[in-house]
């Protein structure tokens, strides 16, 4: 019996915020993408993101913005303080939001659900990135995969 060979345009190693959003954006452009992540579940990330209008539009294009409906807070006032100037720099707009604050975990959860629903993500997978080369076979869970391009998105926790 012959093993099935899987061919993809992109392998993305790391399903954090950047890796996950990149995978979705490439999928929307009709590329065949597989994303692998070492961690099996999401961390309890309490950080927030300030999202400007362009980023909001990007998240809308990906179909993720509406998934955050109950977890968005408008930015109505921005105060910038530094150690050089005595006066704070204040931006305020009472007519429209200057952006939106969202939780990292909420956005990543929505992105991961999108990837998981389409079977584009494999978690609990640790690859030796030193041995991976584009257009060379990669063994994942006893299956053979080929990728034209590889994106490594390991973020701040990467150690070589």
Residue ranges and their predicted role:
Residues 6, 73-74, 79-160:
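Conserved N-terminal helical subregion
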Residues 20-21, 54:
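Short alpha-helical segment within the catalytic ATP-binding CA
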Residues 2-18, 34:
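Beta1/beta-strand and adjacent pyrophosphate-binding region of the FAD-binding site
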Residues 11-13, 24-47:
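Glycine-rich FAD pyrophosphate-binding loop
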Residues 45-82:
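N-terminal FAD cofactor-binding segment of flavoenzymes
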Residues 18, 41, 157:
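Conserved Rossmann-like nucleotide-cofactor binding loop
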């Amino acid at each position: 019996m012959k093993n099935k060979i899987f061919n993809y345009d992109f392998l993305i190693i790391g399903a954090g915020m950047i890796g996950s959003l990149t995978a979705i954006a490439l999928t929307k452009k009709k590329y065949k993408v597989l994303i692998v992540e070492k961690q099996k579940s999401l961390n309890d990330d309490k950080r927030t993101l300030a999202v400007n209008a362009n980023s909001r539009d990007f998240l809308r294009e990906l179909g993720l913005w509406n998934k955050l409906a109950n977890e968005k807070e408008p930015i109505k006032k921005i105060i910038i303080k530094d150690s050089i100037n005595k006066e704070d720099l204040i931006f305020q707009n009472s007519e429209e939001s200057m952006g939106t604050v969202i939780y990292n975990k909420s956005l990543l959860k929505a992105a991961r659900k999108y990837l998981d629903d389409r079977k584009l993500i494999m978690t609990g997978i640790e690859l030796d990135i030193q041995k991976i080369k584009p257009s060379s076979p990669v063994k994942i869970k006893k299956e053979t995969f080929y990728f034209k391009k590889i994106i490594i998105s390991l973020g701040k926790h990467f150690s070589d």
